[in-house]
Structure formats: structure tokens, C-alpha cells
């Protein structure tokens, strides 16, 4: 397959299965909480978990989702795999998070896992994307918009910080398009001025993300 070795293909498949381990569902089960797919927005991600159950399970969920992107990509990087194989490992983990085989192919929206992939590619790339995410979130206080802007800029950051590695740029651009598609309801609310702010009043329950 397009010049990939058997071990690289196996690694890509393994990354998909790793990505399919839904941090939100697993964390909530271990902590005796509800199923985030059945409550709030129905999205098994850190934002919904935070709104439903608080900061601690949300932080663990966020870390777990990021590690699903960081670990396989960093390992492929350290193993000296081809640039295409490295980014396809990240893509597979990202797709696993969105469409997990272990949870009925109903996964999250992919922001944290994509951010983890960026850190796995290189620390400067990850820092650039994360920095953009945090800066926009602080200024605009809209979680979905900060994620969309940060991931939209990810291909540009890779081009500038990875010597124009077009395999990484191209696959990351595809990931960004998929992520935008997964956020289409958020985008509709943004255009209507109805999207939730990050900081909500205690007890508020407008589960839209």
C-alpha cells in the first residue's frame, strides 16, 4: 500500500483500535458516573463530561483523548517510520476516536485527539496549535470556535515548522475538514450567535456541544 511496510500497516491498524478506546465512556464508567452519550449533548468528549460531571473526570478524559494521538504518533516518529506512515498513524487514531469500533462507531468530535497527534508530530507543532486554541478560548470564550480556528491553522503550522512536509500537511488538512464536519451543528449555532460560552453559570444545562 503506497510504499508502506507491513509493520507500518500494522501500526496504523493498531492506532485505530487505540483511538477507539473512548476515554469519556471509560472514565465515566470507572468513576461510577453516567454515560455521556445518553446525557447532555450526547457527545463523549471532555466538554460534555465537564458540563455533566465536573472538572476532574473532564480533565482525565481530555488527557486520555490527547494521549491516544500523542503516543502512537510519537512512537512511529521515534521508530523512524516514513512521514506518510507517521501521519497515517495519527489519522487512524483520530478516526478511531470519531468512529470507535468498541462503542458502536459513535465517538467524539476529535479535537483533543487531533491536538495529541500534533504534539506527536513535534513539540513546536503541538505547542502552536494548543497555544492558538488557548488564546482564542481566553479571548472569545467559545470552546468550539477556538477548536475550529486552531485546527484550521494546523496545516499552516505544519508547513512552516516541518519543512513543508506535504504528507503531513495534506493528511492534517483532511483531518481538519472532517473535524469541521463533526462540528457542523456548532458552526450553525455560531452563525446564529447561539453557541455556548466556555464559562457557564452553575447549574446551567444547555448541552449543545
UniProtKB/Swiss-Prot annotation:
<comment type="subunit">
    <text>Probably interacts with PlsX.</text>
</comment>
<keyword id="KW-0808">Transferase</keyword>
<comment type="pathway">
    <text>Lipid metabolism; phospholipid metabolism.</text>
</comment>
<feature type="transmembrane region" description="Helical">
    <location>
        <begin position="166"/>
        <end position="183"/>
    </location>
</feature>
<keyword id="KW-1003">Cell membrane</keyword>
<dbReference type="GO" id="GO:0043772">
    <property type="term" value="F:acyl-phosphate glycerol-3-phosphate acyltransferase activity"/>
</dbReference>
<keyword id="KW-1208">Phospholipid metabolism</keyword>
<feature type="transmembrane region" description="Helical">
    <location>
        <begin position="85"/>
        <end position="105"/>
    </location>
</feature>
<feature type="transmembrane region" description="Helical">
    <location>
        <begin position="142"/>
        <end position="162"/>
    </location>
</feature>
<keyword id="KW-0444">Lipid biosynthesis</keyword>
<dbReference type="GO" id="GO:0008654">
    <property type="term" value="P:phospholipid biosynthetic process"/>
</dbReference>
<keyword id="KW-0472">Membrane</keyword>
<comment type="similarity">
    <text>Belongs to the PlsY family.</text>
</comment>
<dbReference type="GO" id="GO:0005886">
    <property type="term" value="C:plasma membrane"/>
</dbReference>
<keyword id="KW-1133">Transmembrane helix</keyword>
<dbReference type="Pfam" id="PF02660">
    <property type="entry name" value="G3P_acyltransf"/>
</dbReference>
<feature type="transmembrane region" description="Helical">
    <location>
        <begin position="7"/>
        <end position="27"/>
    </location>
</feature>
<dbReference type="InterPro" id="IPR003811">
    <property type="entry name" value="G3P_acylTferase_PlsY"/>
</dbReference>
<keyword id="KW-0443">Lipid metabolism</keyword>
<protein>
    <recommendedName>
        <fullName>Glycerol-3-phosphate acyltransferase</fullName>
        <ecNumber>2.3.1.275</ecNumber>
    </recommendedName>
</protein>
<keyword id="KW-0594">Phospholipid biosynthesis</keyword>
<feature type="transmembrane region" description="Helical">
    <location>
        <begin position="117"/>
        <end position="137"/>
    </location>
</feature>
<keyword id="KW-0812">Transmembrane</keyword>
<keyword id="KW-0997">Cell inner membrane</keyword>
<comment type="function">
    <text>Catalyzes the transfer of an acyl group from acyl-phosphate (acyl-PO(4)) to glycerol-3-phosphate (G3P) to form lysophosphatidic acid (LPA). This enzyme utilizes acyl-phosphate as fatty acyl donor, but not acyl-CoA or acyl-ACP.</text>
</comment>
